[in-house]
């Protein structure tokens, strides 16, 4: 069939761009015949494909991005990394990598989604040879959706247990406690014999009720990955409740998601402010904040500091997951995504920095109360959320109130990240379905199947060996290594294959002006260099996963982790090689064909220079001489 090329590629109408009663094109490129007038009805009485949704108001998009990108990592990981890597000095590599890596890629993904009006896979119709990036992001976000919700389930469990007069993790004597359990004490108490005449050396071997509640009651931790054990029925119910909540947040699309995030994205800030006010009034809070910010300039010479800064930026900005492109795809075509990206990046990093004051004011109080150095109580990740902070609130007046506030904030921080991640996955999935496969309740059923599948996989994490499985997912599947790999190839595809100047023109077409040239320079040079540099450092300084500094994973457990990582990382080269091998012609012809963009219907007004093409609408019949052939794939 004859093909008519536009200025920068060939046109393709994606399913969600067909308005009203329109249906997919027939095999000859013309609209397929239907039962309605002029053949425009759906064939055989099939349902019409609805137009792609857009945000009710632009603030819905802003709040959704805040809810997704600002998550648990901002509260429980950044403050610890800042303390561990030289205090205020850590802000130097953090800000530098944000400027040359985080913000440019953050903007790239949002603008790409807005321009292509597609989810994480079809967005790469801009450079079809690199569609493997879309499949890779779908794999990564699926892994994230699977294991991330476990933190919500644990947080929900702690929240329920907080509604008691005495917190269950504050005292010994419960069925899950061992004879080695000793309640919270000051370090000097052991020296003067006020704790049952035990010496400090003897007490060092005893266990806190907070740790025993976490390991023996919540996790019911087994001896290793090879001993899966039974399900924890209480945590399983909490997990099920979380998945039901996520389902009803996502099932109706961005119209419902955009409303829910107004609460889930803003209320955690209210709780953070309340906790900060409470924290700074506690004894020892100032010491904790000083430890958080105290500069250690020698740390700048350590490669690990730069690795930690880079991985934290890419993880907290939610880069490489495909969800940002999905959220951007629901924007109006002329939305100022450049301004939005800058604002969102500042909110993200600002939240991380602010959360450090909240966390370390509490940890400073905790260290003072126990008479130990703050390094003994500083934790990161689940250790902060479920050991350090629960221990701290037991020392406060009205402990259940502060525990309930903290875990409610934790639940909300994770909830919007979770359901927006699921939204990104579902968007990419539904964009793949041809228009002819559309059916009523397609979204609702797809979301239900996704949630059900993830729930079944999550059952492996509520067993006695569940924490070992959780750590495998966390350490390998969505690690800094996989996200840096994604970001590197995104820069290559857009800046070097499609063309950085060309994409800057596309952005100008949307927002009315070209962004700062810094973005183009970053996409072309600085960002890929930073990504590849930190990626290589990650590989060179790789350390096998160890749980709680004691349990070493078996070789097959580590192999499983690397399988998680490689299942996404190999999508890019395998798809690229597969396309080149299947295509026909010389290598130059294959490359030219496979890197030619496939435009959507909404690009006609902006991309086509031919008057016939510019005036084309799907409702207006055209002559054979001026017909534009619509193709669905470049393969």
UniProtKB/Swiss-Prot annotation:
Residue ranges, compositional bias (Low complexity): 25-35
Region ranges (Disordered): 1-35
Catalytic activity: creatine(out) + chloride(out) + 2 Na(+)(out) = creatine(in) + chloride(in) + 2 Na(+)(in)
Chief location: membrane
GO molecular function: creatine:sodium symporter activity; gamma-aminobutyric acid:sodium:chloride symporter activity
Glycosylation sites: 192, 197, 548
Modified residue annotations for Phosphoserine: 623
PTM entry text: Glycosylated.
Residue ranges of the TM segments: 61-81, 88-108, 139-159, 231-251, 270-290, 305-325, 342-362, 395-415, 445-465, 480-500, 521-541, 561-581
Localisation: Cell membrane; Apical cell membrane
Family under the similarity heading: Belongs to the sodium:neurotransmitter symporter (SNF) (TC 2.A.22) family. SLC6A8 subfamily.
Name this protein carries in UniProt: Sodium- and chloride-dependent creatine transporter 1
């Amino acid at each position: 069939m004859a093909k008519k090329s536009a200025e920068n590629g060939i046109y393709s109408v994606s399913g969600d761009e067909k308005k009203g009663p329109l249906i997919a094109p027939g095999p000859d490129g013309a609209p397929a015949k239907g039962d309605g007038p002029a053949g425009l009805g759906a064939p055989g009485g099939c349902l019409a494909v609805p137009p792609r949704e857009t945000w009710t108001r632009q603030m819905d998009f802003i709040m959704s991005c805040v809810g997704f990108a600002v998550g648990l990592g901002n509260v429980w990981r950044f403050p610890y990394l800042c303390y561990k890597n030289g205090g205020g000095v850590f802000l130097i590599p953090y800000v530098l990598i944000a400027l040359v890596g985080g913000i440019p890629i953050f903007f790239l993904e949002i603008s790409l989604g807005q321009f292509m009006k597609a989810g994480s896979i079809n967005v790469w119709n801009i450079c079809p040879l690199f569609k493997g990036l879309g499949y890779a992001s779908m794999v990564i976000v699926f892994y994230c959706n699977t294991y991330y919700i476990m933190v919500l389930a644990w947080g929900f469990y702690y929240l329920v247990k907080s509604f008691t007069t005495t917190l269950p993790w504050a005292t010994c004597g419960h069925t899950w406690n061992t004879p080695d359990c000793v309640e919270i004490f000051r370090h000097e108490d052991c020296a003067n014999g006020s704790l049952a005449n035990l010496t400090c050396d003897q007490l060092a071997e005893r266990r806190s009720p907070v740790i025993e509640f976490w390991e023996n009651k919540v996790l019911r931790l087994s001896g290793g990955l090879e001993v899966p054990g039974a399900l924890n029925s209480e945590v399983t119910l909490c997990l099920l409740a979380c998945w039901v909540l996520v389902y009803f947040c996502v099932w109706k699309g961005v119209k419902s998601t955009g409303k829910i995030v107004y609460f889930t994205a803003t209320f955690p800030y209210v709780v953070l402010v309340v906790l900060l006010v409470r924290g700074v009034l506690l004894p020892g809070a100032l010491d904790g904040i000083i430890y958080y910010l105290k500069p250690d300039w020698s740390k700048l010479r350590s490669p690990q500091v730069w690795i930690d800064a880079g991985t934290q930026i890419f993880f907290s900005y939610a880069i490489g997951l495909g969800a940002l492109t999905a959220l951007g795809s629901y924007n109006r075509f002329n939305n100022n995504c450049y301004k939005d990206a800058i604002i969102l990046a500042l909110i993200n990093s600002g939240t991380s920095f602010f959360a450090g004051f909240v966390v370390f004011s509490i940890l400073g109080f905790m260290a003072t109360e126990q008479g130990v150095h703050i390094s003994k109580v500083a934790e990161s990740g689940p250790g902060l959320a479920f050991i350090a902070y629960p221990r701290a609130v037991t020392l406060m007046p009205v402990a259940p109130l502060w525990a309930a506030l903290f875990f409610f904030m934790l639940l909300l921080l994770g909830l919007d990240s979770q359901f927006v991640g699921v939204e990104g996955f579902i968007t990419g999935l539904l964009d793949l379905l041809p228009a002819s496969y559309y059916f009523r309740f397609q979204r609702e059923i797809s979301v239900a199947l996704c949630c059900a599948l993830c729930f079944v996989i999550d059952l492996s994490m509520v067993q006695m060996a569940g924490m070992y499985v959780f750590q495998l997912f966390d350490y390998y599947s969505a690690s800094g290594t996989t996200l840096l790999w994604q970001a590197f190839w995104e820069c290559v595809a857009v800046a070097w294959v499609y063309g950085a100047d060309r994409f800057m023109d596309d952005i100008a077409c949307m927002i009315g002006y070209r962004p700062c040239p810094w973005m183009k320079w970053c996409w072309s040079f600085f960002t890929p260099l930073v990504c590849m540099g930190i990626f290589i450092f990650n590989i060179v300084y790789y350390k096998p996963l160890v749980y709680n500094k004691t349990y070493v994973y078996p070789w097959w457990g580590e192999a499983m982790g690397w399988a998680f990582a490689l299942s996404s990382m190999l999508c890019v080269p395998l798809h690229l090689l597969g396309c080149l091998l299947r295509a026909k012609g010389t290598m130059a012809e294959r490359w030219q064909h496979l890197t030619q963009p496939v435009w959507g219907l909404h690009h006609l007004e902006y991309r086509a220079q031919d008057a016939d093409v510019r005036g084309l609408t799907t409702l207006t019949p055209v002559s054979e001489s001026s017909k534009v052939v619509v193709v669905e794939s470049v393969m």
